[in-house]
UniProtKB/Swiss-Prot annotation:
Keywords: Repeat. The lineage of its organism: Eukaryota, Viridiplantae, Streptophyta, Embryophyta, Tracheophyta. Belongs to the PPR family. PCMP-E subfamily. This is Pentatricopeptide repeat-containing protein At2g37310. Residues 613-643 are annotated as: Type E(+) motif. The keyword Repeat applies. Residues 537-612 are annotated as: Type E motif. PPR repeats lie at residues 21-55, 56-86, 87-121, 128-165, 166-196, 197-232, 233-267, 268-298, 299-333, 334-364, 365-399, 400-430, 431-465, 466-501, 502-536. GO terms for molecular function: RNA binding. It comes from the Eukaryota. GO terms for biological process: RNA modification. NCBIfam families: PPR (TIGR00756). The gene is PCMP-E49. The keyword Membrane does not apply.
Length: 657
C-alpha cells in the first residue's frame, strides 16, 4: 500500500515537473526494474540528473541494482561514487551485485575499502548481516583458499560485531569452512549457533558428505531427525544418499529412502539422480535401472549415475551399451565413462574415448584429466602425458591436486623423474597427497635416499604422514634393499606416527627382506604377523625367492598363492620357470599341465603405438590382424639384419620366436 502511494507521489511529481524526494524516485525505479522496464528507469535517472538531485543511499542502491542487473557496472560505480555519505544500503547493493555475478575479488576489495574508510565509524555505515553474508558467499565461491587471512578477519569481525547469533551469517561461515575442507571449524560454528534453521543442518550434513566424513554425515542426519524443530528435506537426503553410496551402506540408505517417502519429500530430478546413484553404487543395479527406466525426465547426471554403477561392478559392456543410447552427452557422462574404463583397466578405450570426446566438442576438466593420465601411464605414453600437462597449464587445471599427482606419477613411471620433480616444485598445494606422490616417484626408481630426504622435509614443514605415505617410503627400501632403515620406520609407525601397520606395510617389509636376500627373516616375519597374510605378502616372498633361485621357499609361497588366487597366471609362470632353471623338467611340465586343466593361458605380451587414428595395440604371436603376414615379414627382415650385424646372437633370436 505504501509502495503504491510512493509511486503515485513520484508520478504526480513527474506530471507537475517538480523535483520530488529521493525515496519516491527510489520506489519508482525499484518498480520499473522489477517489471523489466529499463527505458523508464533511464528516463527517471536522466530527470534526477537534470534536477540536480543528489541521490541518497536508498535511491542510489536502487539505481545500482538496476545498472548491475543490466551488467552496466561502470554506470553503477558512477552512481556509487556520487553518494556523499554512504551507508550499508549502498555498499550492500554493490556487494550483492558482485557476488551474484561471481566477481569475488571486486567484492573483497569493496569490503576491505569499506571497513577501512572514515565513514565506517558511523553506526549506519557499519556492515550488517547482509554484508557479511555476501563476503562469505564470495569466499565460498572462490577457489583461491589462500584468502584464509581474509576469512579469519571476517570471522573475527562477526564475533566482535555480535553477528555470530545471526543464522544467515552462521550458515555462511559453515558453507565457507566446509568448502575449504576445514570441517572442524564448520562444526564449531554450528555448535556455537544460538539459532539454527534447516539450511544450517543441511550445510553441515553436506559438508560432511563432500569431505568424505560419511559416518559423521549419517550421525548428523540422525541428530536432525531427533530434533523436533526441523525435518529433512530434499537437499538433506541428497547429501545423505551420496554418503551412503560412497560408503556402500545399503541398510542406512534404505532407512533414508523409507523416511523420505514417509515425509512426502517431492522427487525432483536432482533427488532422483541421488537415489539412483546410491542404489547403483551399493550394487543394487537392477533396482537402480528400474528407477532409471521409470523416469520421464533424465539428464546427463542420470545416465552418469547408472554408467558409474555398472563400471564400479565391472559391467563394462552394459555401461557402454547405455552410453551408446545417449543422444546428447554431457561432460559428467563422459567423465563417468572415461573414469569407469580406467578403473576396469580398459586403457586403450580410455584414450580413444577421450579422443572422441574432444571430437564431439566437449571440453575436458580436472576429473577427465586425472582419469586419462593413468591410462597414458599404463600405455607408456610419455608424449601424451606431456601434452596433457601442457593443456592443464594453459587451462589452469595444473592447480588441481589430483591432476598434479597424476602428472607426477606419469612422469616418474615413464622415466622422466626430473619432470616429476619440477611439477612438484611448482605445486602450490603441498598437501600430503602431493608429498606422497613425489616420494612414490623416487621409490619407483629405487632412490631410497631421495625418498627419505623428502619424507624428512615433509615432516619438518609440519605435514604428518598417513598410512599411504609410509607405504611409499617402505617400498623405496624394497627397491634399494636397505632392510635396517625399513625396519626402523616400520617399528616406529605406531609409537611415532600413531598408525597401526596394515597388510600393505607388512607386504612391503616382506619385499624389503626378500630383496635383501634375507628369505629366512622374511619367513619368520610372516609367521609373526598379527593379521592373516594376503596374496600380496606371499607374492612378495615368491618374487624374492625367484630372484635368489630358492626353489623350496618359492614353492612354499606358491602353494599359498594357488589357494588364494587360483586364476593368477603369473604365479604359475614364475614357478614353472624356476623349475625349468633348476633342470626339474617334470615338475615344470606338471605346473603347465595344471594351468591347462584349469583353463588358464599365459597372458601374452602387449605393446602399443600411437597413430593419427588412435592407439593401436599389438599382442605377441597374434596372427588375427589382416596385415599380420606383412608385419611378420618386416620383423623377419629386421631380425636378419640384426643377426648379420651381430647385434644379438642367433640363439636369442630363436628364443624370441
Amino acid at each position: 500500500m505504501k509502495l503504491g502511494f510512493e509511486i503515485q507521489r513520484a508520478l504526480q511529481g513527474l506530471l507537475n515537473k517538480a523535483a520530488v524526494d529521493g525515496g519516491a524516485y527510489g520506489h519508482l525505479i525499484q518498480h520499473f526494474t522489477r517489471h523489466r522496464l529499463p527505458l523508464h528507469v533511464l528516463q527517471l535517472h536522466a530527470r534526477i540528473v537534470v534536477f540536480s538531485i543528489k541521490p541518497d543511499n536508498f535511491l542510489a542502491s536502487k539505481l545500482i541494482s538496476f545498472y548491475t542487473r543490466q551488467d552496466r557496472f561502470r554506470q553503477a560505480l558512477h552512481v556509487f561514487d556520487e553518494i556523499t555519505v554512504r551507508n550499508a544500503f549502498s555498499y550492500n547493493a554493490l556487494l550483492i551485485a558482485y557476488t551474484s555475478r561471481e566477481m569475488y575479488f571486486d567484492a573483497f576489495s569493496l569490503f576491505l575499502s569499506w571497513i577501512g574508510s572514515s565513514c565506517y565509524s558511523s553506526d549506519a555505515a557499519r556492515p550488517d548481516s547482509i554484508s557479511i553474508s555476501c563476503v562469505l558467499k564470495a569466499l565460498s565461491g572462490c577457489d583461491d583458499f589462500w584468502l584464509g587471512s581474509l576469512a579469519r578477519q571476517v570471522h573475527g569481525f562477526v564475533i566482535r560485531g555480535g553477528f555470530d547469533s545471526d543464522v544467515f551469517v552462521g550458515n555462511g561461515m559453515i558453507t565457507y569452512y566446509t568448502k575449504c575442507d576445514n570441517i572442524e571449524s564448520a562444526r564449531k560454528v554450528f555448535d556455537e549457533m544460538s539459532e539454527r534453521d534447516v539450511v544450517s543442518w543441511n550445510s553441515m550434513i553436506s559438508g560432511y558428505s563432500q569431505s568424505g566424513s560419511f559416518e559423521d554425515c549419517k550421525k548428523m542426519y540422525k541428530a536432525m531427525l531427533a530434533c523436533s524443530d526441523f525435518k529433512p528435506n530434499g537437499v538433506t537426503v541428497i547429501s545423505v544418499f551420496q554418503a551412503c553410496g560412497q560408503s556402500s551402506d545399503l541398510i542406512f540408505g534404505l532407512e533414508v529412502h523409507k523416511k523420505m517417502i514417509e515425509n512426502h519429500i517431492q522427487m525432483d530430478l536432482s533427488l532422483c539422480n541421488a537415489v539412483i546413484g546410491f542404489y547403483a553404487k551399493c550394487g543394487s543395479l537392477d533396482y537402480a535401472r528400474a528407477l532409471f527406466d521409470e523416469m520421464s525426465e533424465k539428464d546427463s547426471v542420470t545416465y552418469g549415475a547408472i554408467i558409474s554403477g555398472y563400471m564400479a561392478h565391472g559391467l563394462v559392456k552394459e555401461a557402454m551399451a547405455l552410453f551408446s543410447e545417449m543422444e546428447s552427452i554431457g561432460l559428467s557422462t563422459w567423465n563417468a565413462m572415461i573414469s569407469g574404463l580406467m578403473q576396469n583397466n580398459h586403457h586403450e578405450e580410455v584414450i580413444n574415448s577421450f579422443r572422441e570426446m574432444i571430437r564431439c566438442g566437449s571440453r575436458p576438466n580436472t576429473v577427465t584429466l586425472s582419469s586419462l593420465l593413468p591410462s597414458l601411464t599404463y600405455s607408456s605414453n610419455l608424449k601424451g602425458g606431456k601434452e596433457i600437462h601442457a593443456f592443464a597449464i594453459r587451462n589452469g587445471a595444473d592447480n588441481n591436486i589430483y591432476v598434479t599427482t597424476s602428472i607426477i606419477d606419469n612422469y616418474a613411471k615413464l622415466g622422466f623423474l626430473l619432470g616429476a620433480q619440477r611439477v612438484f616444485d611448482n605445486c602450490k598445494d603441498r598437501s600430503l597427497i602431493a608429498w606422497t606422490a613425489i616420494i612414490t616417484a623416487y621409490a619407483v626408481h629405487g632412490d631410497s635416499d631421495s625418498a627419505c630426504s623428502l619424507f624428512d622435509q615433509m615432516q619438518c614443514l609440519g605435514t604428518k604422514p598417513d598410512d599411504v605415505t609410509l607405504t611409499a617410503v617402505l617400498s623405496a627400501f624394497a627397491h634399494s634393499g636397505d632392510s635396517d632403515m625399513a625396519q626402523h620406520i616400520f617399528d616406529s609407525m605406531l609409537t611415532k606416527y600413531d598408525i597401526e601397520p596394515g597388510v600393505e606395510h607388512y607386504a612391503c617389509m616382506v619385499s624389503v627382506l626378500s630383496r635383501a636376500g634375507k628369505l629366512s627373516d622374511a619367513m619368520e616375519f610372516i609367521s609373526k604377523m598379527p593379521i592373516d597374510p594376503i596374496a600380496k605378502v606371499w607374492g612378495a616372498l615368491l618374487n624374492g625367492a625367484s630372484v635368489l633361485g630358492d626353489l623350496e621357499i618359492a614353492r612354499f609361497a606358491c602353494d599359498r598363492l594357488f589357494e588364494m588366487e587360483p586364476e593368477n597366471t603369473g604365479n604359475y609362470t614364475i614357478m614353472a620357470n624356476l623349475y625349468t632353471q633348476a633342470g626339474r623338467w617334470e615338475e615344470a611340465e606338471m605346473v603347465r599341465n595344471k594351468m591347462k586343466r584349469i583353463g588358464l593361458k599365459k597372458i601374452p605380451g602387449t605393446s602399443w603405438i600411437e597413430t593419427e587414428k588412435g592407439l593401436r595395440s599389438f599382442i605377441a604371436k597374434d596372427s588375427s590382424c589382416e596385415r599380420s603376414k606383412e608385419m611378420y615379414e618386416i620383423i623377419e627382415g629386421l631380425v636378419e639384419s640384426m643377426s648379420d650385424k651381430e647385434y644379438i646372437r642367433k640363439q636369442e633370436l630363436d628364443e624370441a620366436y
